[in-house]
Amino acid sequence: MELIYGSTMRKKWIEPALRFLPVGLCISALALMLKSKEGNENGILEYKHVGAFRYLAYANGICAAYSVLSTFNSVVPRSCSLSRAWFVFVFDQAFTYLMLGAGAVVTEVLYLAYKGDEKITWFEICPYYGRFCNRVAASLVISFLALLCFIPLSLISAYRVFSKYDPPSLCKKDQITSQS
């Protein structure tokens, strides 16, 4: 935490930068996903035909909006009350897990699209829809880059919340048994 709280200059720009960077990343991933459409003699494949891809698109849109709001919240000087710290902590955790969950689901579906699974008669589709798969894969990679911004933000907000509490007292085993 020295990197975050050591220098005043570092403290002033690291968190807002980590909060603003996902805006561009999430919007880029969202735009790529929305443009993912390809047709051939087998039919037309769009992102909206696959629930996991819609989930990632929605997650990127929601996280971009949250990043804008949280960036504004981090640059406007306010007192760091316990309730505000908890609010930021809960939302940082929620959006980090939203991105993680969406990325994990799309990773699995994309793996099946590339490799298939003959045991359950799920055949690979990426040889037939290569451009579509490449765009979805690029959107997924960009989403994971946004996740790499959300993870340290979750750690920073967790540190802010839990540093406001006293550590638990350490008791010896004899003290515990004598109190019972």
Curated annotation (Swiss-Prot):
GO CC terms in record: plasma membrane
InterPro entries, sorted: CASP/CASPL, CASP_dom
Record's subcellular location: Cell membrane
Membrane topology classification: Multi-pass membrane protein
Pfam family, one: CASP_dom
Topology Extracellular: residue spans: 35-55, 107-135
Transmembrane segments annotated in the record for this chain: 14-34, 56-76, 86-106, 136-156
Cytoplasmic face of the membrane: 1-13, 77-85, 157-180
Chief subcellular location: membrane
Keywords associated with the record: Cell membrane, Membrane, Transmembrane, Transmembrane helix
Similarity section: Belongs to the Casparian strip membrane proteins (CASP) family.
PANTHER family named among the record's database cross-references: CASP-LIKE PROTEIN 2A1, CASP-LIKE PROTEIN 4A4
Summary of subunit composition and partner proteins: Homodimer and heterodimers.
Name of the protein described by the UniProt record: CASP-like protein 2A3
Species of the source: Picea sitchensis (Sitka spruce)
